[in-house]
Amino acid sequence: ASSVPSTAALLADACWPGPLTVLVPKADHVLPVVTGGRPTVGLRVPAHPLTLDLLERFGGGLAAPSANRFGKVSPTTADHVRADLGDLVDYVLDGGPCPVGVESTIVDCTVDPPQILRPGGIPDEQIAALLRNDVAPAAGPSRASGMLASHYAPTARVLLANSATEARQLASVNPGAEVLDRTDDLVESARHLYDDLRDADRRGVSVVVAVMPPALGLGHAIRDRLAKAAAAG
């Protein structure tokens, strides 16, 4: 980074290591290929012990794009990465299933007030509390991974329902549809979301009717991913 805004430092101190990415002005030596040609760079310190060990052994920062094909369902296990990328990568570090499941929260700290570009593993409410509610939702053109309207999409068509009753009704008029409802436990829902969608594809399910969780805590991230998966259909 060429500079670290005070909001980025505050969030990093509170949430790192953990699933938070802060967008800050990039340093001049950072290559455009790392930032997609943008003047900003996303920084994160993950909490997984295997990744922390890798960073310590390497002794510097790593440019680490997502290990999945563009627009498709994110991987949460080493097997998912192998299935998606095959021989395109030489090695896969296997640290077990991702404990959070959904990606990191991305906060753009180059604007005032900061904007949550992508809800994720750090709930929006926690970000707002740390910034004393001086935070805004994403606005303007795409500036980070996962901001496109259609993303995280399985082969199966995804339909959204606001309740279990509505989900059953939608499933009844869509032959071959299955209902996905983990709204009773948001932590488990986030952890298994992508694996559930991948499992539906593995079994040849043509339509997934997903019950939207409440818009609180990890529910923000789950709703975001399901809405983007549904937009692809």
Where on the chain are the PLM-derived regions?
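Active-site-adjacent structural elements in enzyme catalytic cores
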Residues: 1-233
